[in-house]
Swiss-Prot record:
SMART domains linked: IL7
Family membership: Belongs to the IL-7/IL-9 family.
Entry-linked PANTHER family: INTERLEUKIN-7
GO molecular function list: cytokine activity; growth factor activity; interleukin-7 receptor binding
Name this polypeptide is given: Interleukin-7
CC annotations in GO: extracellular space
Protein role: Hematopoietic growth factor capable of stimulating the proliferation of lymphoid progenitors. It is important for proliferation during certain stages of B-cell maturation.
A GO biological process held by the record: positive regulation of T cell differentiation
Gene symbol of the encoding locus: IL7
Biological source species: Sus scrofa (Pig)
Residues bearing carbohydrate: 94, 115, 140
Signal peptide positions (record): 1-25
Disulfide cross-links: 27-165, 58-153, 71-116
Length: 176
């Protein structure tokens, strides 16, 4: 006997497709005119870009964070909110006082421009993690340096995505 699902016989779409919510943002943006972004955040993002040594290998590896969260239509605000929370984790790297200052400026400045629902705020971002300890101290130092380079690559890519997403929001605001 053939075992065929009832809904496929009559062309009824699977229930999951019917129940999917319409794509919408969980956050509202304040300051869409771009004044705070261009005068404060953009300056710090550009300074951070100059401080990070660019490695051409960075572009080949797309981090999981960016695979899960993107600056799609109607989700720009929630992407920027999550990205700003992710930036806070990089302050722990203690690269320099100036670097931490710019990271804090971009992170806090972005977070203050958004009013997000508890659905987004309730999530705790994953930690950057630590390299596992090994028996050989030199190997451990090498792993930590590779991890640091990987984190800086991720930070560089994340900053570029943040800048692109902000520009997308500002272009959309000027059209109205």
């Amino acid at each position: 006997m053939f075992h065929v699902s009832f809904r496929y016989i009559f062309g009824i779409p699977p229930l999951i497709l019917v129940l999917l919510p319409v794509a919408s943002s969980d956050c509202d943006i304040e300051g869409k005119d771009g004044g705070v972004y261009q005068n404060v955040l953009m300056v710090s993002i550009d300074d951070l870009d100059r401080m990070i040594d660019f490695d051409s290998n960075c572009l080949n590896n797309e981090p999981n964070f960016l695979k899960k969260h993107s600056c799609d239509d109607n989700k720009e605000a929630s992407f920027l909110y999550r990205a700003a929370r992710k930036l806070k984790q990089f302050i722990k790297m203690n690269i320099s006082e100036e670097f931490n200052h710019h990271l804090s400026t971009v992170s806090q400045g972005t977070l203050t421009l958004f009013n997000c629902t508890s659905k987004v705020k309730g999530r705790k971002p994953p930690s950057l993690g630590e390299a596992q300890l090994t028996k050989n101290l030199e190997e451990n130092k090498s792993l930590k340096e590779q991890k640091r380079q990987g984190d800086l690559c991720f930070l560089k890519i994340l900053l570029q995505k943040i800048k692109t997403c902000w520009n997308k929001i500002l272009r959309g605001a000027k059209e109205y």
